[in-house]
């Protein structure tokens, strides 16, 4: 008897951090994984690692903000394997600056990833998932889209766009068998802070009691959401507590964030 084909997952932002860790874990869990990011060399390294461990992988280097390029990737995935039953949107770019400190190119880049990248990949495979009557879209969100802090204007706006995409998709998909999930992580020990060494000091002091999470732990959380889809997930639990504090006492929470965050 021929064994069933392994399911297909697309992971954006797969060249490092949460995306790379998630791709490794999905491959080890029996998924055929499509790696998506802009850095071709890093993708090839990860693809080689996954193949050496016995996994099935495709590496697609592109700017996911380019809708036409995403469509071409989608066609290649369908041709080589099958439409994916999982899309993990972990691509994200950005600098934490006041708006007047941010140049137009940086603003466009931050809208490109995460928002346009997620919208393009969800759109590319939406019809396939609806026809199959199932599938999952998981988006990696930022606390900045829950409780904005000062000094990260364009970054925050781009994360709110991703949150809006998820919330709209969730409503669109009710009763279809296709799910949209938003997973919020606190600070993650990834390359972001190495590439943006001054950004850590801009996190409001009120967020200092939320522990740092590793990309590998984030990947485990995401795999848990694959197995049991939920609309919104917070990790670690202290982040959920802060979110509830913001909902119950919005004015005091905003005051604390403003007072302990970056100032002009």
Predicted regions span which residues?
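Conserved glycine-rich cofactor-binding loop
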Residues: 15-16
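Conserved glycine-rich Rossmann-like NAD(P)H-binding loop of the short-chain dehydrogenase/reductase
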Residues: 31-45
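The beta1-alpha1 cofactor-binding region of Rossmann-like NAD(H)/NADP(H)-dependent oxidoreductases
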Residues: 61-72, 104
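Substrate-binding pocket helix/loop in short-chain dehydrogenase/reductase
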Residues: 98-111
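Active-site helix of classical SDR
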Residues: 122, 158
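Residue(s) in the substrate-gating loop at a strand-loop-helix junction
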Residues: 142
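SDR active-site lid
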Residues: 171-237
């Amino acid at each position: 008897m021929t064994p069933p084909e392994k399911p297909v997952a697309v992971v954006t932002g797969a060249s490092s951090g949460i995306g790379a860790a998630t791709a490794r874990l999905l491959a080890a869990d029996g998924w055929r994984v499509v790696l998506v990011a802009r850095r071709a060399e890093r993708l090839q390294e990860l693809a080689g690692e996954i193949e050496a461990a016995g996994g099935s992988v495709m590496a697609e280097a592109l700017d996911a903000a380019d809708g036409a390029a995403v469509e071409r990737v989608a066609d290649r995935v369908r041709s080589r394997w099958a439409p994916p039953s999982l899309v993990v949107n972990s691509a994200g770019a950005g600098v934490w600056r006041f708006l007047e400190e941010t140049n137009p190119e940086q603003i466009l880049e931050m809208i490109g990833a995460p928002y346009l990248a997620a919208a393009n990949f969800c759109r590319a495979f939406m019809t396939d998932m609806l026809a199959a009557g199932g599938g999952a879209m998981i988006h990696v969100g930022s606390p900045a889209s829950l409780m904005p802090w000062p000094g990260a204007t364009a970054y925050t706006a781009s994360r709110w766009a991703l949150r809006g995409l998820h919330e709209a998709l969730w409503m669109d998909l009710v009763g279809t068998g296709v799910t949209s999930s938003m997973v919020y992580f606190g600070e993650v020990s990834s390359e972001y802070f190495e590439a943006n060494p001054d950004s850590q000091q801009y996190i409001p002091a009120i967020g200092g009691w939320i522990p740092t999470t590793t990309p590998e732990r984030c990947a485990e959380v995401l795999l848990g959401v694959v197995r049991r889809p939920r609309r919104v997930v917070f990790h670690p639990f202290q982040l959920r507590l802060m979110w509830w504090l913001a909902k119950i006492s919005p004015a005091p929470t905003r005051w604390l964030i403003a007072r302990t965050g970056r100032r002009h």
